[in-house]
Amino acid sequence: LDLIGQASQILKLAGEIEGRGRNEDALAYFRDGVQFRNCLLVELPRGDFGDTMLRQFLFDAHSVLLWESLASCAHAVLSAIAAKALKEDKYHLRHSSEWVVRLGDGTD
């Protein structure tokens, strides 16, 4: 799952739990401005490649911890979504952490 796929599945589940007939699109797009939430970390200025990769690493590390926790929850559907997302996010964490180490080592 990419981030859009993860969000879509979580919002679909939220709509089912809510029980008011709203699908993922209704939950995602049809709300007041103050109801929108996001991770402020990803709003930081891009900066150079090192800044970008460190920010990506921090985001990936948080995502892995979140999905690990949700993968062991009692709600079967949420647990399944989290397990699938965790697999992909571990790949992203490995990729970004390799870049952080590479950039941290510098050049000779």
Predicted regions and their residues:
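Alpha-helical bundle segments that constitute or directly flank the non-heme di-iron/ferroxidase center
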Residues: 1, 45-73
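Conserved alpha-helical segments that form or flank metal/cofactor-binding pockets of metalloenzymes
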Residues: 2-30, 96-101
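Short secondary-structure boundary segments
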Residues: 37-39, 63-64, 68, 77-78, ...
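A contiguous pocket-lining binding segment that forms or flanks enzyme active sites
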Residues: 77-108
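Acidic/His metal-coordination segments adjacent to aromatic residues that form catalytic metal sites
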Residues: 30-56, 103-107
